[in-house]
Curated annotation (Swiss-Prot):
Topology of this chain in the membrane: Peripheral membrane protein
Purpose: Promotes mitochondrial protein synthesis. May act as a fidelity factor of the translation reaction, by catalyzing a one-codon backward translocation of tRNAs on improperly translocated ribosomes. Binds to mitochondrial ribosomes in a GTP-dependent manner.
Protein name (database record): Translation factor waclaw, mitochondrial
Gene symbol of the encoding locus: waw
Pfam families reported for this sequence: EFG_C, GTP_EFTU, LepA_C
Catalytic activity: GTP + H2O = GDP + phosphate + H(+)
Protein source organism: Drosophila melanogaster (Fruit fly)
InterPro entries referenced in this protein's UniProt entry, alphabetically: EF-4, EFG_III/V, EFG_V-like, G_TR_CS, LepA_C_sf, LepA_CTD, LepA_IV, P-loop_NTPase
Keyword terms: GTP-binding, Hydrolase, Membrane, Mitochondrion, Mitochondrion inner membrane, Nucleotide-binding, Protein biosynthesis, Transit peptide
Residue ranges of every copy of the tr-type G domain listed in the record: 97-278
Annotated positions binding GTP: 106-113, 171-175, 225-228
UniProt record similarity statement: Belongs to the TRAFAC class translation factor GTPase superfamily. Classic translation factor GTPase family. LepA subfamily.
PROSITE patterns in the record: G_TR_1, G_TR_2
Amino acid sequence: MIVGYSVFFHHTVTRRTWCAVTIFFCRQRNVNSAMIRAISIRWLLQRPGDKRHSAWLVARSKSLLVRNLSTTNQVKGETEEPSQADLLREFAHMPVERIRNFSIIAHVDHGKSTLADRLLELTGAIARNGGQHQVLDNLQVERERGITVKAQTASIFHRHKGQLYLLNLIDTPGHVDFSNEVSRSLAACDGVVLLVDACHGVQAQTVANYHLAKQRQLAVVPVLNKIDIKHANPDQVCQDLKLLFGIDPDEVLRVSAKLGTGVSEVLERVIETVPPPQVQRDSDFRALIFDSWFDKYRGALNLIYVLNGKLEQNQDIQSLATKKVYSVKSISVLRPAECPVPDVSAGQVGLIACNMRNSKESIVGDTIHLKNQAVAAAGSYRPQQPLVFAGVFPADQSKHVALRSAIDKMVLNDSAVTVKIDSSPALGQGWRLGFLGLLHMEVFCQRLEQEHGAEPIITAPSVTYRLVLSNPKMIKQQGRDTMDISNAALFPEPHSIKEYYEPLVLGTIITPTEYVGQVISLCVERRGLQQSSVNIDDTRVLMKYVLPLSEIILDFHDRLKSLSSGYASFSYEDHGYHPSHLVRLDIHLNGKPVEELCRIVHVSKATGVARQMVLKLRELIPKQMVQIAIQACVGSKVLARETIKAYRKDVTAKLYGGDVTRRMKLLKQQAEGKKKMRMFANIRVPHETFINVLKR
């Protein structure tokens, strides 16, 4: 057909020769005829002498050929891959020796989801150029923000040295606020692909994820991505990997996930490097729940990693944590779409539906087993403790039940979030939620709105402080001499507190050398203490700082990116509690305290925060019949004050002359009336004012 096209268009012998070579090459590599026609016709239609178009066409042809070769997953001398039905039959009989469980870990925006797309295309799990990029990023918030916030799983098949292998792939988030997703995913893995951007090199979350993998003693496959970009520097990045992690540069794979270059070598290296799972198929069934989500028709769906034995449909399973028994209604494997299978065996990952209607019954990290069988807990995953807390209230109290249901379903899908009941005289009944960071909080609330139609009011984030009590009565009430508090309204009186402690984090910052001075100034401004500073190479520095958590949860990351022109990266981990000097900042309106507006701040920041709050309240509180004095106080000391003038009624407007004593009498009566009003009147603060002050 191609020769027919060439004769029809009467083009030069050179083009016909190129087409013939292309056809021969494609047929040798089993590329489908549609690809042959696409490449050849574009070449035949090229105008003679158009060198620019010719260069583009050659590059495009190479790209299409590489990606098509990856998609077909066929090399010379191998047979065609089996159909989907054949693969699912193979799934049931796949020996443990030919199973590999691995995750892709990297810093944010290093190309994890794009590489996952190429791997899915290469193994035939999805169609090439299916019209959707980042297939595993299926949440609306992920597509809007361009980041991965939820780890996703896909089971793929790949032929290696004549044998078919089952690879369970997990694409993980790269932002530090979603490190719980990475930790949860690694509980079901035996190895990781450590992906590094060949342009930006090793960044903060790369370091954190690498150490997390090594703590679990997982095999590491180092891969450099984006080698097709003009300013990529793979040699220097390989040296950085050697300096920081001791990785041999010769072991680092170089790929372009965008073009598909070198992607097949990644799968080959995974099969050769990552060990098969250490499981037992001849023992009693035991599995770890490492993810779950809610389906309105099937209830809670649980993603399980089978540690021992085998699970079949219609068997009865029991939760080790709740002791409740369920019947398995369906078993599926994610490819990444759900594909029903009759059973799952040790070493495999499966999705089970067991009519679990209460979202609280599904616990990530729980162990499940067959009914009336005694097994030990898996114990390989523990949720991280939240660092940032915020109040969540319904905009309308009539929607309290609906918001509660939405939060329960979201927490099922995000086990890092903690929920406690809270109330506020200004905002009504609500909850106090714990998150791993500010972005985690923003994404959670955005998902509440998009996926459940909720309209929550989110208060300003805070952290948990630890107090050592000196009051015997309070110690007896608490049952111990310490008290953890994240709500400033519950802050005890200073005379009842012996010591204050605030949470710290160990932050890792990687920045270009020209911005080191600005970064140090920012850290000092946020009360940071430098722990170490290492030159990665001639252009970048890795610094470690101990910082108060309260100083970084709001705008630290934004400030860091701004002063470094976007080149610095930052990640952090919990560093315990440290003694500090904290005070409770109270807001008074005409001498009366307003508990809903109080805050806990460090003594060095108290004056600045006080000034900001009184200025904001002056703008938000409307004028009233009496003058309003807004004061920010620590104890009895006033740190800042603003005044809202009262409405003025011109009581002398009706006078048109006469004795001046009449005018003075009216003004005196007005002054006495205002004085009396100040003594007995309550300041009316609109509900919207509280919302605007309290919300982030």
